[in-house]
Amino acid sequence: MNASGSGYPLASLYVGDLHPDVTEAMLYEKFSPAGPILSIRVCRDVATRRSLGYAYINFQQPADAERALDTMNFEMLKGQPIRIMWSQRDPGLRKSGVGNIFIKNLEDSIDNKALYDTFSTFGNILSCKVACDEHGSRGFGFVHFETHEAAQQAINTMNGMLLNDRKVFVGHFKSRREREAELGARALEFTNIYVKNLPVDVDEQGLQDLFSQFGKMLSVKVMRDNSGHSRCFGFVNFEKHEEAQKAVVHMNGKEVSGRLLYAGRAQKRVERQNELKRRFEQMKQDRLRRYQGVNLYVKNLDDSIDDDKLRKEFSPYGVITSAKVMTEGGHSKGFGFVCFSSPEEATKAVTEMNGRIVGTKPLYVALAQRKEERKAILTNQYMQRLSTMRTLSNPLLGSFQQPSSYFLPAMPQPPAQAAYYGCGPVTPTQPAPRWTSQPPRPSSAYPPGASMVRPPVVPRRPPAHISSVRQASTQVPRTVPHTQRVANIGTQTTGPSGVGCCTPGRPLLPCKCSSAAHSTYRVQEPAVHIPGQEPLTASMLAAAPLHEQKQMIGERLYPLIHDVHTQLAGKITGMLLEIDNSELLLMLESPESLHAKIDEAVAVLQAHQAMEQPKAYMH
């Protein structure tokens, strides 16, 4: 029977309990005999791209989906039985609990199929599952019927029955909130109290004598070990809640034989663990609120810096409540924490100290974050990079390209007209080096479509170094500001009529050239600084314009990455340049940190490639 809460037949199945290695191709091979399939999707984690253990299969015809549900449910796939049910698009139907029953005290050998076979006689089952962990069945399960009447009939018939020689409990499913509310209501009416820190010589009779004054007791028990010795705690169960409450009030904290007794409401282990967990979480949240915005994380510390030196370096920016350098075996681990008394002081310290050289290393200073927060931020950054990579049609886009040492901008030439250079020497256009104080020379630009020609009386002389120029121009050029281009002093152009013209907006410079200059034409190349050869310091980086800082770092990163991953050097460099500049400087100084980041980038690229493979298969 096809269950649909919306009035039209469904053709979509939910397939759960999948092996982590199951792919769309395996599911297609498994389910295609049932009928034509429109789509298959294995749900995966957004960050790791690992399977979440379930999938959705859309058939063309509802009858085919129903056939697959009836004939393939609980069949084995890669050594695991799969669980199939109708895909319910309405979450309200799944979460309402209508028709859902809870079964506990199940025998270990009862699995999903056995539970399904047992309860299928009462009506159509939408879902059936036995809760399991790494050790097997946890002894309880759930069966979701299509109707409330079928669920009620199953409860009336099966509750208290024997399944594999075990008496099972069957009842309506209750959410955790409902169960906790019931436990809270029962806790207010407790009659059983827990007593600990008893003297060793106190037995059941002694415990009864201590509590008999408060009312009638139904049972008294002192817990003992295997050898019969008292474990110094026990239980007292009263007939009425008021009597138990009175005993707790008067006996908790009372001294007996030199020991202070503890008396309180008896709790189950799970209840105690949940209460302790709530207390721990509350303490954790209080501590986080107390240190929110005032605790700083400091890394790349010099080995000579200890707690006192760390406090001294940060003390000018405010009142420090604690300063700690993390150590292992008495040696610094290279990072620590500084806690200020106010967020304003912490913000000032981050602004002033981040990137400052203390000892021999530049510090990295930022607000301390919890592991969960860091993981969320890294996941968000990964997803942003992933979405960017998806939009790139050209795999080379977004990559960092190692800039050529010099290039000539391409100038369009008329197809039927030869290009000639002027009488002045032509110098290859080159960006001004950023790491020297040498100012760029004045630039000269040609309007679009202008051709550099000589009058017809001068014989054609090709440039001497045109091959090297062409080779350089094939590399991907960097965008160069107009003020950094090298001028071709003395170059002028003439139109077809022989009338001299010059670049608009610039005065015409006189050309004083001998005929020998035309016959012995040479290209004079200035000295070229190869970028990335000199060390990059924090002061050099700070002195550079903001838009050039990443380029300066990239020029030094690219050769290092190219030595490790030749094919992916451009992409990896582009990904690493998204990191903060202070961290990039640390990576340039520390090969270990750089290689670790390279490995992370390679993992991201491989994950993206693995994600694209199923799409290629589907198409």
UniProtKB/Swiss-Prot annotation:
Q: Where in the cell is it found?
A: Cytoplasm
Read off the PANTHER family from this record.
RNA BINDING PROTEIN
Tissues where this protein is expressed: Expressed in ovary and testis. Also expressed in pancreas, liver and thymus, and at lower levels in other somatic tissues including brain and lung.
Tell me the InterPro entries matching this sequence.
Nucleotide-bd_a/b_plait_sf, PABP-dom, PABP_1234, PABP_HYD_C, PABP_RRM1, RBD_domain_sf, RRM2_I_PABPs, RRM_dom
Query: Which is an annotated GO molecular function term of this record?
Result: mRNA 3'-UTR binding
Q: Which organism is it from?
A: Homo sapiens (Human)
Q: Which UniProt keywords apply?
A: Cytoplasm, Differentiation, Disease variant, Oogenesis, Repeat, RNA-binding
Q: What disease is associated with this protein?
A: Oocyte/zygote/embryo maturation arrest 22: An autosomal recessive, female infertility disorder characterized by oocyte maturation arrest, primarily at the germinal vesicle or metaphase I stages. In some cases, oocyte reaching the metaphase II stage can be fertilized, but embryo development is arrested before the 4-cell stage.
Specify the effect of R374Q: In OZEMA22; uncertain significance; the orhologous mouse mutation results in female infertility due to early embryonic arrest; no effect on translation activation; no effect on poly(A) binding; no effect on cytoplasmic localization
Q: Which family does it belong to?
A: Belongs to the polyadenylate-binding protein type-1 family.
Region (Disordered) residue ranges read 431-458
- What is the predominant subcellular site recorded for this chain? cytoplasm
Which domain of life, per UniProt? Eukaryota
Q: What are the record's GO terms for cellular component? A: cytoplasmic stress granule; cytosol; extracellular exosome; nucleus; ribonucleoprotein complex
The UniProt entry, under CDD domains, shows: RRM1_I_PABPs, RRM2_I_PABPs, RRM3_I_PABPs, RRM4_I_PABPs
Identification of the protein by name:
Polyadenylate-binding protein 1-like
- Could you tell me which Pfam families the record lists for this protein? MLLE, RRM_1
**Residues annotated as domain RRM:** 11-89, 99-175, 191-268, 294-370
Sequence ranges assigned to domain PABC in this UniProt record: 533-610
NCBIfam families cross-referenced by the UniProt entry: PABP-1234
Asked if the keyword Nuclease belongs to this entry, the reply reads no
